[in-house]
Amino acid sequence: MKRIYKLIFCVIVMGFLDSGCGTAYKVVMDQRNVKTQAQDEKIELTIRKKLADSDQVKLFDISTYCFNGNVYLVGEYDVSSQKGDAVKLAKQVEGVKSITQYFLPKKAGDHCGTSDNIELAVKVTANLVKDKGISSTNIKVKSVQCNIVLLGLVGSKKQITKAVAHAKSVIGVRSVKSYLKVF
């Protein structure tokens, strides 16, 4: 029970930091100019709205990220057609240059649930924040079925290598997929 309370606290803190408290800091620390950041945010929100309005795709199963017009769709699907539907909806959005997808089929009886995914993402993020040699505010961490996906723009290949190593060091992580790019 104590673990659940810790987890809920971490989720609330992460949401608070992500929603506004850290926004000004993130804008300043981001490698992209403010206009590009705004365009990317608009693309993300537009895709999320399209996913929410869709009868075929489940919004909460897919996360959307955008960096310099390059979109990343990350999540799970019940039936294979949901992947194509999500990509088709994302392609309709103005400003999208490319779409990269990381989808896993939902597995009945998988022992990695929502709380496990949240816990792993929080632990990986904490490892990244502790390392002052990494621009952690520029890295998004998503866990899907206990597989970590790293996304964002960083300053060097060394930062990418370190970020992947930090993610792999967390107990319970099944695999790490990096979509990190050097800005």
Label each residue range with its predicted role:
Residues 2-6, 16-183:
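N-terminal targeting leaders
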Residues 11-12:
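Classic N-terminal secretory signal peptides
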